[in-house]
Amino acid sequence: MYLFFITSELKKWLRDPLLSFMLAYPIVFALLGRYGVPWLAKVSGINMALFADLVLVVLTLMTPHIFGALIGFSILEDRDDHVLTSIQVTPLSVAGYLSFRFVLVTVLACVSTWFILWFSQMGGLTLSQMGAVALLSSFAAPLTGLIINATASNKIEGFVAMKGIIGILIIFPIISLFFMDAKEFIFAIAPGFWPAKVISSIVRGEGVLLLSQGQYYW
């Protein structure tokens, strides 16, 4: 049954031009990290090693939100087609149906994020560190999907909501990287704050990531 759901979901994504295009984003991000950033550094003469954590944060945080948008649009389509209403008369509950789909995108986001970190070869992260960062950041995928469905009633509204949601959820962690005092915790409300802090701590060689304001500054 679960294999059928996975196949059905992937077919739905591939049928839609927008969703199928979004599926290619992780590959694009991986190629940008591996070849685009070094090329830009060579052309501009900028030492990108100084900004490795910033680049990795952008690539890492974007991926789960893309998968969250995928499942968000897919559920919006189901709502338009009254699929969720039809499921209520089947042995499968709506909660079980949605839970499975959110687990699916979380796993895909985790694997894709790990692949981007591994393929880009930036920051000197170990495989276990890549796995930890990928797992931590992947939980943003279902959150994005839920927020899109809470703020939009159709795919057009969903597209507008997606741009605003992803922009806000990504810009806060990025801004936090420019603060070296307790002010950075202002941006801790964003889900991507801690994945960004983990990446920054590893890339900058700060060692153990402290988890409270007191440990950091007192």
Per-region residue spans from a language model:
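N-terminal Sec/SRP start-transfer signal
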Residues: 1-19
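Membrane-interface helix termini and inter-helical loops of multi-pass transporters
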Residues: 38-50, 120-125, 185-187, 201-205
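Alpha-helical transmembrane segments of multi-pass membrane transporters/translocases
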Residues: 24-26, 197-218
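Hydrophobic alpha-helical transmembrane segments
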Residues: 20-23, 55-59, 99, 103, ...
